[in-house]
A protein has these predicted regions:
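Cytochrome P450 catalytic-domain helical core, especially the substrate-recognition surface
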Residues: 5-6, 13, 31-112, 124-181, ...
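Cytochrome P450 catalytic domain signature, combining two hallmark sequence patches
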Residues: 16-36, 52, 345-346, 359, ...
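Cytochrome P450 heme-thiolate "Cys pocket" and heme-binding signature region
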Residues: 59, 234, 239, 359-389, ...
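Conserved, non-catalytic sequence blocks in retroelement Pol enzymes and Pol-derived host proteins
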Residues: 61-69, 93-94, 159-160, 201-203, ...
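Conserved cytochrome P450 catalytic core segment spanning the I/J/K helices
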Residues: 62, 164-248, 278-286, 290, ...
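Central I-helix of cytochrome P450 enzymes
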Residues: 103, 107, 112, 164-172, ...
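Cytochrome P450 heme-binding "Cys pocket" and the immediately downstream C-terminal segment
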Residues: 259-261, 382-420
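Conserved cytochrome P450 K-helix/beta-meander segment immediately N-terminal to the heme-binding cysteine loop
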Residues: 333-361
Length: 432
């Protein structure tokens, strides 16, 4: 049990598959801690609302829309490369914060059409509020009193949470209001915008952000309320930078420690992107061809899964692997342990991208690899995330050789809401 409450920790792929496919499970109480900030956005909602909103948001990740997002990813990656120049001096560089600010700028512009410019101005009120709000949720998650939600209202953290939520929500509502004015300055403009959307559909030439999509859809014949839109925008800001930051940083770290694998990735970049890889605008088609880089990223996500554990709760009696599971039991699906199971991945601590060749992948059972969760509630933005990770890494490796850091700065991990470094992710950068 955990905190004197019944729970089952699972790392067996067969059992995980049965849990993820069951109709009598929902997310655990942990996700309730996010509702003051995220409301009932996609990561928290259940039932018909989740089904409807998932259907509404899915078109935002059609490959035609992803091609438009690549314009943003390319630009912000170029800003990152420029910022790193001052750190390419032979000493250890903590790339984690740099990548965090880059990822925030990418998701803000993709989701809201807002240029946060976090890479230039990392101490904005909104960015700091997002960071602190995440910390409060984390502390509640590991509190001995986490099941007693009523007690939280009497704490200093609750008062601070209310202040932070106001900052974050006010920012989002202002963005929604400003975007509405841009799209619908008057009735004639509204008709013109709707006609253009109808002609181009969701997949047309017009760059469609998540916010634009939400402003132009209807549910049961009615537009979404500002509150519903804000919930989904906040959800994407919350989920859209942490995991990509870790994936990019951890991949860079592993490459810095294996010169032969790094050289093979670099050779692939030169062969497919071309000799101008340092500055060329990366396209969807080009990134899809970088198969070895994708294998490297997948191996990083195996060793360092962004979300090392996910929770589910049984809402009715169920049978798992022949055993009756009572209503109210919490399942903790241990993705980190699953990904480091020596029966699935021999010598699991060894970094080996060949595990994700087509031949090797098909031999593993279902649910043996799930860095983006699995089942119907898997990560809706996983293709977006993979494109972003590839884009940043191509730019990084085209411009810099990565060398290992000093022993004192070797990677140490901790489990927050995602898997994070204790003191940062350090590499040495050498300009190519």
């Amino acid at each position: 049990s955990l905190f004197n409450l019944p729970s089952l920790h699972v790392s067996d792929a067969k059992v995980i598959g049965q849990i993820m496919q069951a109709r009598t499970v929902e997310k655990t109480i942990v996700y309730d801690f996010m509702t003051p900030w995220l409301g009932t956005g996609l990561i928290v909602s259940t039932g018909s609302k989740w089904t409807q909103h998932r259907k509404i948001i899915t078109p935002a990740f059609h490959f035609k829309i992803l091609e438009d997002f690549l314009v943003i990813m390319n630009h912000q990656s170029d800003v990152l490369i420029e910022k790193l120049k001052t750190s390419a001096n032979g000493t250890d560089c903590n790339i984690y914060n740099h990548v965090t600010y880059c990822a925030l700028d990418i998701i803000a512009e993709s989701a809201m059409s807002v240029k946060l410019n976090t890479q230039q101005h990392p101490n904005s009120e909104y960015v700091l509020a997002v960071k602190e709000m995440t910390d409060i949720i984390l502390k509640r998650l590991f509190s001995l009193f986490r099941e007693y939600k009523w007690a939280f209202q009497f704490t200093k953290a609750h008062r601070r949470q209310r202040e932070l939520v106001k900052v974050i929500h006010d920012f989002a509502y202002k963005v929604i209001s400003d975007r509405k004015k841009q799209l619908y300055s008057d009735a004639q403009e509204q008709q013109r915008a709707q006609k253009q959307l109808a002609e181009e559909a969701v997949y047309g030439k017009r760059r469609m952000t998540l916010l634009d999509l939400l402003l132009n859809v209807t549910m049961d014949g009615k537009p979404l309320s500002d509150s519903e839109i804000r919930e989904e925008v906040d959800t994407f800001m919350f989920t859209g930078h942490d995991s990509t930051t870790s994936s990019i940083s951890f991949t860079a770290y592993h490459l810095s420690r294996d010169a032969s694998i790094q050289q093979r990735v670099y050779d692939e970049i030169l062969a497919i992107v071309g000799p101008d890889a340092k500055t060329v605008e990366l396209t969807y088609g080009t990134l899809q061809k970088l198969k070895y880089l994708e294998m490297v990223i997948k191996e990083t996500l195996r060793i360092n899964p962004p979300v090392p554990v996910i929770g589910r709760r049984s809402v009715g009696d169920m049978v798992i692997d022949g055993v009756t599971i009572p209503k109210g039991l919490d399942f903790f699906i241990m993705i980190y342990l699953l990904h480091n199971d020596p029966e699935l991945y021999p010598e699991p601590t060894r970094f080996d991208p060949e595990r994700f060749s087509e031949e090797a992948s098909v031999k593993r059972p279902p649910y043996s690899y799930m860095p983006f969760s699995a089942g119907s509630r898997n990560c809706i933005g996983q293709r977006y995330a993979m494109l972003e990770v590839k884009t940043v890494l191509v730019k990084l490796l085209a411009n810099y050789q990565l060398l290992p850091c000093e022993a004192s700065n070797q990677l140490r991990l901790k489990t927050d809401m995602t898997l994070k470094p204790v003191n940062g992710v350090f590499v040495k950068l050498v300009r190519r």
